[in-house]
Amino acid sequence: MIERGKFRSLTLINWNGFFARTFDLDELVTTLSGGNGAGKSTTMAAFVTALIPDLTLLHFRNTTEAGATSGSRDKGLHGKLKAGVCYSMLDTINSRHQRVVVGVRLQQVAGRDRKVDIKPFAIQGLPMSVQPTQLVTETLNERQARVLPLNELKDKLEAMEGVQFKQFNSITDYHSLMFDLGIIARRLRSASDRSKFYRLIEASLYGGISSAITRSLRDYLLPENSGVRKAFQDMEAALRENRMTLEAIRVTQSDRDLFKHLISEATNYVAADYMRHANERRVHLDKALEFRRELHTSRQQLAAEQYKHVDMARELAEHNGAEGDLEADYQAASDHLNLVQTALRQQEKIERYEADLDELQIRLEEQNEVVAEAIERQEENEARAEAAELEVDELKSQLADYQQALDVQQTRAIQYNQAIAALNRAKELCHLPDLTADSAAEWLETFQAKELEATEKMLSLEQKMSMAQTAHSQFEQAYQLVVAINGPLARNEAWDVARELLREGVDQRHLAEQVQPLRMRLSELEQRLREQQEAERLLADFCKRQGKNFDIDELEALHQELEARIASLSDSVSNAREERMALRQEQEQLQSRIQSLMQRAPVWLAAQNSLNQLSEQCGEEFTSSQDVTEYLQQLLEREREAIVERDEVGARKNAVDEEIERLSQPGGSEDQRLNALAERFGGVLLSEIYDDVSLEDAPYFSALYGPSRHAIVVPDLSQVTEHLDGLTDCPEDLYLIEGDPQSFDDSVFSVDELEKAVVVKIADRQWRYSRFPEVPLFGRAARESRIESLHAEREVLSERFATLSFDVQKTQRLHQAFSRFIGSHLAVVFESDPEAEIRQLNSRRVELERALSNHENDNQQQRIQFEQAKEGVTALNRILPRLNLLADDSLADRVDEIRERLDEAQEAARFVQQFGNQLAKLEPIVSVLQSDPEQFEQLKEDYAYSQQMQRDARQQAFALTEVVQRRAHFSYSDSAEMLSGNSDLNEKLRERLEQAEAERTRAREALRGHAAQLSQYNQVLASLKSSYDTKKELLNDLQRELQDIGVRADSGAEERARIRRDELHAQLSNNRSRRNQLEKALTFCEAEMDNLTRKLRKLERDYFEMREQVVTAKAGWCAVMRMVKDNGVERRLHRRELAYLSADDLRSMSDKALGALRLAVADNEHLRDVLRMSEDPKRPERKIQFFVAAYQHLRERIRQDIIRTDDPVEAIEQMEIELSRLTEELTSREQKLVISSRSVANIIRKTIQREQNRIRMLNQGLQNVSFGQVNSVRLNVNVRETHAMLLDVLSEQHEQHQDLFNSNRLTFSEALAKLYQRLNPQIDMGQRTPQTIGEELLDYRNYLEMEVEVNRGSDGWLRAESGALSTGEAIGTGMSILVMVVQSWEDESRRLRGKDISPCRLLFLDEAARLDARSIATLFELCERLQMQLIIAAPENISPEKGTTYKLVRKVFQNTEHVHVVGLRGFAPQLPETLPGTDEAPSQAS
């Protein structure tokens, strides 16, 4: 029999009162005896701390705190330790005789919270001779020792051979080791399990009936049926997963259209934009290249036009210069003609005016003589009138002064002043400073005499003047003629100059007669010279146009060469036209062919895409239509083979499912009828009794019982007999065995065990030999093992079946795809590649365009050469007739010579024409120039002087006369004398005034008459002089004009000038015509250059913009391509058939897809934002980001449990293959997974029945326990009424509630909860969910009610409550319950632990003084019967007769507190003896 493990000792190190104390524990009861504060509770606290080192649970309260709601602040542990390292260790020995030391290292943590640090550890392999205190202490001397810290302890143990030290970081690991080694009874997997264990220890420690345990006895006593719960959970999980998968399939089916729509629209949206950008990039590149070609061509054209413009501008400049010269010559010729005509008219006017001047000269001389006589008479009259006027004025002045003096007395002074003024004036005029009033009369006579003398002298000079006048006029006339011809000169030189002029006139007339012959000769030579110059100009222009200088002798040969070149170029131009037409015809044919190929290309590309998809799907390459049809036949054969294999795998999988279902029956029954028969017979299936058999023992028991392993064990066979009569619903062989199901063993057979077999002696004459089965199915462990292997096989079969089904579906879809391909694309798919042909044709088209361009250039050059040759021939036709003129080199010299002679002759003719008349007039009177009448001028001056002297003498006489007349004013004496004296004077003055006025009147009349006559004479003279001067001036002007004209007017001059003008006009017209042509050509050339310049600028701008756009687009395109390649979507986006659509079509396609996508992603915020960002036309990469995001979104939505791919497009293809198959398979799987409500009820009932039997067995162990009035203790287990009704409905009336269990919306747990609510509407479920309630209803423990009952005195069986029992009875009852719990835990954990391990049993009891001796004896008896260790604490008055007793006494020695311990063995049979080594000397830690 397996020995039970025991606790050997408890060691306390550095606890309060215990420095190093080891308590040896008795195999039954260990008693700690001592007074208050002796250390009993501390010792038990150390044991509990080493057993359960969980600070969240540990709480050591004193007995006085039993009614307190909260304990001490440190929960009782901190105060039980000393400073420094502390240990609590348990020394145990298990059923395998292995010594295991487990314990904890404790250490106080500084701080107000009074915390304790705990480190659990375990020591294995420690020799029995080593004491625990030796491990953790180090002796320093006889009186001192040191506690080793944990790391030193570890090092010390590692140095010992065979000793293992383990330190644990978690309490779970610590308890797991203790459970595996048999130290604790139950595996404590969680904090809840630890809490239950601690509550059990706490309940035993403080005694009594623990309400915490009695309220939850089900949790303590009834094991959790994890297998059933796990089965239900697995079933529900499988059903939930199945239904979720089915729902996912339905969602996927609904999403499939969304997937298709989203993928197709996203592909259309992004691919259209992608291909549009690709097309635009290609178009932009083509445009950039075209712009560059056009730019190069335009630059060449502009350079050619610029060269042409320079040539024409140079020629135009030459023509402009020539035109200026010709205009100047023409203007000069016109001016010369005008001058000749003007000179002729001037000459006629001069002759006419000269005749008029001669006539006027004669009349003017006559009138001069008349006027001279009239002037003399007029002067005499003027002098006489002036004298009379002066006399009258003087007399009036004198008379006026006199009247004033008479009127006013004051006028005397005025008169006196006037007299003085007259005297002064007379002094000044007469130059007589000594003149006085008295001497004025004398001087008056003198000056009157001078006046008379001057008058006589003037008259004599006047007579001399008239006589010399005639001789002087002839000399002056001759002299003026000489001055007019020769210019100013001295009078004495006039004679010599006049003779020289007359001789020169004769020579000039001889030269003037030669003007006309010279002019005619000059005109002829000038005409030839102009023709020569024109020929030279034509030759120079021809050489310039030809770009080469030619000699005169080479021109005829050149003329013939140019004519031959014209003929050959004409043939070349005609041939080039035909060649150009042929090239253009070929180009049109190529263009037509390219258009047809471009129309066929999308169809071919679609067929190729379909073919590539088929090739990718089947992994084959097709080169002809025959390959396609042959592969289609292979597909049909492959489909048939796959269907056959799929059906075989499906049949095997169904067989495995059936076997799994059969093995999964509760109780190990493979036939449901056996469960019903066992329930009917009141028995238990043999497989249920052996349900806990281990996997190693399963083959043995399976062979032992053989066919009877499915037997029913019944208590009494006789009671079954009546049920066998008429029994039909049963297996063919039904085995019944009589025995007690609670204590059944294999003693019913006589067995001999052989090698892997047994011989069963059923009877004396019947043996059965059974070999151990290779796959045992007896016992739950064997069945679970088999089920596990079957599940693995089923997974393989399911995967194979799914693979085959997928292959069949894939093959069928591939067959359909091939059929569609044959019907749609087979006719065109294997034709030649239109794109390759398009590329070849495009290259040929480029060659043709290049050939046409070269041909046009060559043809243009030929045309230019042809035109140049024609122009050269035309120019030579004008030059060749003038070759003789070009050869005449002396023509210009002869023209210059004749021109010089003509200039001399014309100069002579102009001299004769200008001075011929003057010379003719001078010739008759030239002799008068020999003597110059100079005295005429002197006489003329003397006459003027005498006139002046006569006027001065007259004024002097008049002044003296006035003085003499005012002589009376100088001597006024008084007023009377002045009045009387002046009265006579007044009368005289008046008389004289009257005489003077009469004389003045006569003089005035004579002067007036003679003045009128003189005026008439002067008018006639002035008119004649004016006419003469005018005509003379006009004649001089005409002569000067004629001289200024500088031409000699003769009869032929006008005709020669007109001919010259007409010739120059013709040349000027020709030059202007050519200039106009050049200007027009130059204007056209400039316009063409401007157009080319604008075109060039536009092309440069367009080219650079396009190039910049290409470069910018290239960067963006590179980013797009990188993003496309990184995300692997190029195959989806690069749809070549879209390359043949226009940009508008692609944009329209993208816009339509965008509108559809906006609706499709309206509910997805992420895709909506990405789609909105992708609408930016400047950021094409964002569309790729949207496409990637859409694909990622679809990938995330792909059900990986259904579809095994990341590609949404492939997912859609696989969806259509998988959905129907999965739907069918999952529906059948759900039908198989669903467990019936009757099965659930049977499982729960069987479990309840088994646990009731187990509790009944536990009650048998407590029948003999009694405490005081308590005679017996038992556990009563009943099924709750509400739950019993639920089980009845599940097993008998489940058809009425199939609406719950057949609903796909409810799990089985939820359906069970709904049924429970339906059956018990009065029960409030609170806030719990149906799933939670259903899971509770699947736990059989919730169906049971457990309570502790005691048989007390005459009251019989009563419910155990603290109020109805005494303290001792309550402690005994509680201890009984705890023992039952421990035993229940051991039974529950027997399957989890090795068969050779029987765990330690130990409980506590503090304050055992409350029990009487009989109760304590009962505890001893219970411990002995149950092999349980007990530690109790009691005062000193308790001395048990059995076990080991320690007496504890707390002492103080030298300020050091310690506990003195004395140990005693049981002393009832013999004298007590002191245990060795129990007396502890005082010590203190160093």
From Swiss-Prot:
The keyword Membrane does not apply. Plays a central role in chromosome condensation, segregation and cell cycle progression. Functions as a homodimer, which is essential for chromosome partition. Involved in negative DNA supercoiling in vivo, and by this means organize and compact chromosomes. May achieve or facilitate chromosome segregation by condensation DNA from both sides of a centrally located replisome during cell division. It comes from Shigella boydii serotype 18 (strain CDC 3083-94 / BS512). Residues 666-783 are annotated as: Flexible hinge. It holds the Pfam family SbcC_Walker_B. Keywords: ATP-binding, Cell cycle, Cell division, Chromosome partition, Coiled coil, Cytoplasm, DNA condensation, DNA-binding, Nucleotide-binding. Residues 326-418, 444-480, 509-603, 835-923, 977-1115, 1209-1266 form a coiled coil. InterPro entries: MukB, MukB/SMC, MukB_hinge, MukB_hinge_sf, MukB_N_dom, P-loop_NTPase. ATP binds at G34, G35, N36, G37, A38, G39, K40, S41. The hinge domain, which separates the large intramolecular coiled coil regions, allows the homodimerization, forming a V-shaped homodimer. Belongs to the SMC family. MukB subfamily. This is Chromosome partition protein MukB. PANTHER family: CHROMOSOME PARTITION PROTEIN MUKB, DUF4476 DOMAIN-CONTAINING PROTEIN. Gene3D superfamilies: 1.20.58.850, 3.40.1140.10, Immunoglobulin FC, subunit C (1.20.5.420), MukB, hinge domain (3.30.70.3500). Homodimerization via its hinge domain. Binds to DNA via its C-terminal region. Interacts, and probably forms a ternary complex, with MukE and MukF via its C-terminal region. The complex formation is stimulated by calcium or magnesium. Interacts with tubulin-related protein FtsZ. It is found in: Cytoplasm, Nucleoid. One of its GO terms (molecular function) is ATP binding. One of its GO terms (biological process) is chromosome condensation. GO terms for cellular component: cytoplasm; nucleoid.
